[in-house]
Amino acid sequence: MQKIGIYPGTFDPVTNGHIDIIHRSSELFEKLIVAVAHSSAKNPMFSLDERLKMIQLATKSFKNVECVAFEGLLANLAKEYHCKVLVRGLRVVSDFEYELQMGYANKSLNHELETLYFMPTLQNAFISSSIVRSIIAHKGDASHLVPKEIYPLISKA
């Protein structure tokens, strides 16, 4: 059976920090599913289709990465793909508190599921999608924070 990991997120928009985690985690799995969440509760700036297109463009050079959109429980998506490992990023202490709760919740729904946490590299530690959204909303230049393939798409927002 293939070793499969799932890296879920809203990716609104995808950042260099996300790509760094995709790069590092894709080396640990035969297949990495990047799962773009519907996340209507977060009121995303970009539509699900736009976010999926952006992540596909940004990951096209990764041979073992597949990008999918999903709605519903992540634990169910993991079962669908026969995945036993979730990949998550931790930038700050508050991320850990949230991710720990989510990890326990996912484990309670799917007992085979483990969560693997990645700390960002130093140059990406401060980057978040919300910072990028704020910069582009104020007509600033966020090109150094996102993959070059997607900057033309987000700079029009």
From Swiss-Prot:
Cofactor requirements of the protein: Mg(2+)
Mechanisms controlling activity: Tightly binds to CoA, which is presumably a feedback inhibitor. Potently inhibited by D-amethopterin, which simultaneously occupies the 4'-phosphopantetheine- and ATP-binding sites; following treatment with D-amethopterin, H.pylori exhibits morphological characteristics associated with cell death, showing that D-amethopterin displays antimicrobial activity.
**Broad enzyme group:** transferase
- Keywords attached to this entry: ATP-binding, Coenzyme A biosynthesis, Cytoplasm, Magnesium, Nucleotide-binding, Nucleotidyltransferase, Transferase
Query: Which Gene3D superfamilies is this protein grouped with?
Result: HUPs
**One GO biological process term:** coenzyme A biosynthetic process
Q: In which pathway does it act?
A: Cofactor biosynthesis; coenzyme A biosynthesis; CoA from (R)-pantothenate: step 4/5
Q: Which residues bind substrate?
A: T10, K42, L74, R88
This entry carries the following GO cellular component terms, namely: cytoplasm
Looking at the record's lineage, which domain of life comes first? Bacteria
User: Care to name a GO molecular-function term for this sequence?
Assistant: pantetheine-phosphate adenylyltransferase activity
Q: What is its EC number?
A: 2.7.7.3
Please describe what this protein does.
Reversibly transfers an adenylyl group from ATP to 4'-phosphopantetheine, yielding dephospho-CoA (dPCoA) and pyrophosphate.
PANTHER family xref list: PHOSPHOPANTETHEINE ADENYLYLTRANSFERASE
This protein is called Phosphopantetheine adenylyltransferase
Question: Origin organism of this chain?
Answer: Helicobacter pylori (strain ATCC 700392 / 26695) (Campylobacter pylori)
